[in-house]
């Protein structure tokens, strides 16, 4: 889960004076779009041609919650660190900011590959933090590496401050996140780990921990998703990035600040139906890609 449970997090946020997302407070959700999306910001791009099929507030800088873990994973996999190296969950990995729950108890040992798997598929916060903390360069330098990678990818309006996304200071735009998603989609291991429907971890504590994918669309046979990441904190709303095939086209989909977990999935379904209908029209003789709809 991204940060759990949402009701508990909302209570904590309300106590701190936070009752709505940054996007909602800025009025971005009120911007009308032809698909009637819940998300405050959205972007759909044809991965091969680069054509923008749909956009809504794609330049808005917003908190991105656990979408941050996509960059965490990219830095880990490109660092050459051995995935079979054992790391141990420590008190430093416990979330003291939002008090999100985790079944990885302090003292649990797992290898780096397992931590990577859990961070991507089920958005495990302690696993993600442990990935950064266990980097030989130290967690501060690890976060700097995340920001250097963002700059190298052309993510001009993005900043990372931790490996988990728990801080609302991890911020980006739909435009920038499409660049990150495109880069991550070229990493086969990240694609495999992020789209695993279920996974069992034989923990060093003797427990068998069962994890489910945080994206409900993964188990839907009508979807063909090769990479994905979900995210949620109150300030970010419900977020999702995907590399997915729709109507024979490889697309990048970015949704930021949807109004709820169900709304996030419903937005993705609206996009899927719209793209499929537009491709059908194109195949019947009008040609080209779906028209660019700007929110």
Give a label for each model feature.
Residues 2-175, 179-188, 246:
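Active-site-adjacent loops and short helices of periplasmic peptidoglycan-processing enzymes
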């Amino acid at each position: 889960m991204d940060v759990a449970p949402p009701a508990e997090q909302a209570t904590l946020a309300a106590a701190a004076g936070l009752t709505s997302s940054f996007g909602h407070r800025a009025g971005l959700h009120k911007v009308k779009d032809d698909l009637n999306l819940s998300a405050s910001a959205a972007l759909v791009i044809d991965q091969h041609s680069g054509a923008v099929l749909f956009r809504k507030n794609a330049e808005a800088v917003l908190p991105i919650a656990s979408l941050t873990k996509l960059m965490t994973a990219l830095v880990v996999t490109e660092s050459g660190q051995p995935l079979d190296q054992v790391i141990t969950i420590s008190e430093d990995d416990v979330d003291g900011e939002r008090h999100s729950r985790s079944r990885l108890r302090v003292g649990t040992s797992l290898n780096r590959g397992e931590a990577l798997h859990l961070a991507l598929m089920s958005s495990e916060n302690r696993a993600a933090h442990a990935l950064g903390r266990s980097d030989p360069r130290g967690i501060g330098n690890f976060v700097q590496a995340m920001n250097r990678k963002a700059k190298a990818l052309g993510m001009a309006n993005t900043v990372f401050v931790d490996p988990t996304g728990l801080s609302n200071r991890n911020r980006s735009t739909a435009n920038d996140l499409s660049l990150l998603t495109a880069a991550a989609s070229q990493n086969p291991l990240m694609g495999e780990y992020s789209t695993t429907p279920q996974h069992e971890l034989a923990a060093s504590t003797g427990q068998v921990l069962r994890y489910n994918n945080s994206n409900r669309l993964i188990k839907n046979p009508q979807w063909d998703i090769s990479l994905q990441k979900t995210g949620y904190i109150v300030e970010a709303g419900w977020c999702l990035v995907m590399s997915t095939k729709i109507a024979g086209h490889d697309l990048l989909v970015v949704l930021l600040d949807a109004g709820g977990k169900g709304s996030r999935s419903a937005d993705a379904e609206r996009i899927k139906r719209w793209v499929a209908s537009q491709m059908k029209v194109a195949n019947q003789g009008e040609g080209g890609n779906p028209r660019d709809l700007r929110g």
